[in-house]
Amino acid sequence: MKRVLQIMGGLKRGGLETFAMNIYRSIDRSEIQFDFLLTQVAGGDYEEEAKSLGANIYYIPPRNKGYKAYHKALDDFFSKHHDYIAIHEHISSLTSIDPAYYAKKYGIPVRIFHSHSSSIQKSLRLHWVHTILHYLNKPKVHSYATHYLGCSDKALDWMYKYTGVRSKALMVNNGINCEQYAYNKIIRAEVRKEFGIGDADFVIGHVGRFIPLKNQVFLVDILSELHRSMSSAKLLLVGEGDTMDEIKTKVSDKGLEKSVIFTGVRSDVARLMQAMDIFVMPSWFEGLPVSIVEAQAAGLPVVASDTISYDSDLTGTILFKSIKDSAEDWSKCILEWKEKNGRPNNIEELKKAGFDSKTTVKQLVNIYIGNV
């Protein structure tokens, strides 16, 4: 049995965590098993599922709890656990690439950096320190890692430009189980009934962690503008996070409590997307979000900020809009874009584009076993 160590912050239901779990579910676990090395406390949404699939989950203290303790924990871990065929480090920046250093020290042959973002959150504490560290660590990339992956051209440029390895970096698609998202009228009716959504209601959908970069606060402004001409418009928000209370307060201040649905963290995103009429993502920046791939698989038209990678438009159903435009402009575009797009079946198109999880698994397995 070969084992691969997946390295990330935690196993909450976010984009990169969902990507890793999609791969884990689809990979032949009789041949390759995953373990997880995390820096966040136990209790992530995916932890029990990962354990049930055969994973060991290990925890080390995060770097912000003490630099020396962090490095000692990494050294101790890899001195005892160095029989992996590969480590797969999922990162949003190069601020913390030390696991790969210790993996190399203890002889793990395949060491992967995987870029899932295209910038650093400006709301992040000590943002400027993270940015400086990101660029200071670029000269180390070629010696720490053996493979350089990313979810989009923007994510690849952000992580590997000026490192000397950009030409070697590979795009790995955020593959999903496409059939699971295929439009189903029966499920749509069930979900709408569950949340008290009328047949004639117009539902704007969004899936994402409640953090500043996702910009859910702007979605509330958009809904407020839509209500000027369409009182039946509703906002379906899937996820939770640090800014959730702020969003709920804004919803209350605008008197939109009956028009905004907070589902919390859900494991049935494919099902919830059936109830939506359009998917909107006004993020300040992204790599290539898994949720945008999921929305296209569900046949939803998408309006997204132009800070998101244009690589994400796999079906010709995404309208990119400037994040600097007003909520009024966004609301008009949402209505116009919905009118121009029906509810197409995009499954085969996504598969041809290489966004089926089986295709992604094949690519990663070849990297894990050293064929690439």
PLM regions and their residue ranges:
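N-terminal strand-loop element at the rim of the active site
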Residues: 6-72, 242-244, 367
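A conserved mid-protein helix/loop that constitutes part of the nucleotide-sugar donor-binding site
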Residues: 17-22, 202, 206-225, 242-248
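Short hydrophobic beta-strand element within catalytic cores of glycosyltransferases
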Residues: 37-38, 301-305
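A short helix/loop element that forms part of the nucleotide-sugar donor recognition site in Leloir-type
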Residues: 74, 182-197
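Aromatic "clamp/platform" in nucleotide-sugar-dependent glycosyltransferases that forms part
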Residues: 92, 265, 284
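A short, active-site helix/loop in glycosyltransferases that binds the activated sugar's phosphate group
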Residues: 141-182
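Active-site donor-binding acidic/aromatic loop of nucleotide-activated sugar
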Residues: 243-246, 257-266, 272
